[in-house]
Structures are given as C-alpha cells and as structure tokens.
Amino acid sequence: MAEPVLVVGLGNPGPQYATTRHNAGFMVVDILADRMGEKFKVHKKSGAEVATGRLAGRPVVLAKPRVYMNESGRQVGPLAKFYSVAPADVVIVHDELDIDFGRIRLKAGGGVAGHNGLRSVASALGGNDFQRVRVGIGRPPGHKSGASFVLENFNSVERKEVPTILEQAADATELLVAQGLEPAQNTVHAWG
C-alpha cells in the first residue's frame, strides 16, 4: 500500500476566523474533504481535526489544526509521526501575502517569508522539506499591517471570486498529490 500524504490546511479555529484570509487553508481542505465524501473528526493523539480517504488514487490524511495558526506545528508534528508521513509527503495549504490575490502557486522547501504558521510547522517537522499550496491573498492596501490584513474577511469584490479560487486551490492540491511537484507546477502556474 502506498504511503499516505498528509495535507494540512492552515488557519485559526473558531467562527470569528472562519471567513478570514488567514483561513484559506482550512477552506481548501474542507473542499477536499467534501470531494472525498469524508467528514472531519478530532484525532485524539494530536488534537487536530482529520479526515482520511483517497485523493487522486492515493491514501490521504486531511488535517486542520485546532490551535492558533502560529502554533500549528504542535499538532502537525504528532500527526506526521502517527501516520508515518515523511516531511516530503506533507502538503501545507496556506494563504500567501507575497502572491497576488487569486493566484495559486506550488512550492517545496524554501524560507517561510515571515509566515509564523509555516515557521511552526518547519520547527515541528525538523526542517522545511514539506510541499506547499500557496493561495495568493495579495498585499494589504496602503500602510495597513499584514498581521491585521490576514485576520480580516475578504472584501466584497474578493468574495465574488473566492469560491472559484478555493476550488482551483483544491484542484492544484489534487494535482500535486497525483503527479508530484514539477508536473503539477507546470500545470498550475500556467493558470496565471
């Protein structure tokens, strides 16, 4: 049997954060769970919400940490250990300030660019060899701080596009799981 892939959506728990930019990762893994016909349940050993099944023909564990974004590694590390998933088979889905709103980019390794959720995951996994599905949210307007911008809901113009963008991010995640990084990048990055 093939080794599972651990797909983790980053976000903050609680209804007050459910529709914020920082919760794009949660939103994408919710779509993937719906596609798989699976429901999230609390994983007792890690505390995260998990849904298991198959995606693109491979065994997959979807996860949403139930701690604040900056502490995500506290639950991602134990999940990777429990399911015997190597860091290279961990996919983190997250919001990305440094990518224009609506663009999806795939990446493996590299720096965390000030993203504290990624920093926490890298610390828990012993490095940043994991793969990433980066959902572009763009930079805040004017002199607004990135920290406050990511905790805001999408604006009224963005909200019209968000469902399509999240579906594309879910498609990109499926391609990454099915094809591996380079072929998936070639397809996804051609989307614009």
UniProtKB/Swiss-Prot annotation:
Its EC number is 3.1.1.29. NCBIfam families: pth. It is found in: Cytoplasm. GO terms for molecular function: peptidyl-tRNA hydrolase activity; tRNA binding. TRNA binds at residues 17, 68, 70, 116. It comes from Mycolicibacterium vanbaalenii (strain DSM 7251 / JCM 13017 / BCRC 16820 / KCTC 9966 / NRRL B-24157 / PYR-1). Keywords: Cytoplasm, Hydrolase, RNA-binding, tRNA-binding. It catalyses: an N-acyl-L-alpha-aminoacyl-tRNA + H2O = an N-acyl-L-amino acid + a tRNA + H(+). Hydrolyzes ribosome-free peptidyl-tRNAs (with 1 or more amino acids incorporated), which drop off the ribosome during protein synthesis, or as a result of ribosome stalling. SUPFAM superfamilies: Peptidyl-tRNA hydrolase-like. It is an enzyme of class 3 (hydrolase). Belongs to the PTH family. GO terms for cellular component: cytoplasm. This is Peptidyl-tRNA hydrolase. InterPro entries: Pept_tRNA_hydro (IPR001328), Pept_tRNA_hydro_CS (IPR018171), Pept_tRNA_hydro_sf (IPR036416). The record marks 12 as: Discriminates between blocked and unblocked aminoacyl-tRNA. The keyword Nucleus does not apply. Gene3D superfamilies: Peptidyl-tRNA hydrolase.
